[in-house]
């Protein structure tokens, strides 16, 4: 088995937490204990690659930079992505190594600060189309003030009701390919557990001469994870989130869980609008892409059900 695991934001920071380093390390230890359970069941020629989100960490870092800009210059979003990749990669790497060592396993683990290619003419870069919320939720007055201070920002209402329903949104371009694919393939081939494409990867565009340049954007981590799955020739794509299964008719009286379905059914349900754009939508879309590429199985489930889901006992299981 060649397995690509995509960790959700709750694997590193819970919604109710402030996001201290201590809190995040605790969450990483919970997460990597489950990953160690997976590794301990793997055969010698099996491979594991891990990717992760960075939404809360990147949002907090952007707030810190905004508050401190009078003393030190704020950094661009590609730099913020690189910084949080290093932060989260370090925490996951250390925690996983510790659990594997306790089990007598000495599989090398490495975290890679990784670039992902996007198109400079992606529609997300133009007009008011930017769709990825970042930073804190704001009141309408706070949103107006932010727009006054930063006329170049796009600030949108992201929830239909409530007091704090406004957020800054940034471009979320479609990932095209993984810039560091050859290095990652070699490490995976050597039996190393690789943590890569964190937070969707650092968004870069090609300058046409073999050079790359970072851009102000945030790539969806599940879609970038699917591109990473292609790079490492994964046969199984496991997306871990905060629910055991995806749902049809979410939030309605006729809501129902999605168990084992085919690729054709997944495409049908997605086209019917069952999966929301800001949550389950990109996950299902990533699963569809993976199976269309040639993957064998895509799974969506919760962290605590990961091993059961890999054994086919729970989760939303999508096959071609």
What positions do the PLM features span?
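C-terminal catalytic "cap/lid" subdomain
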Residues: 1-320
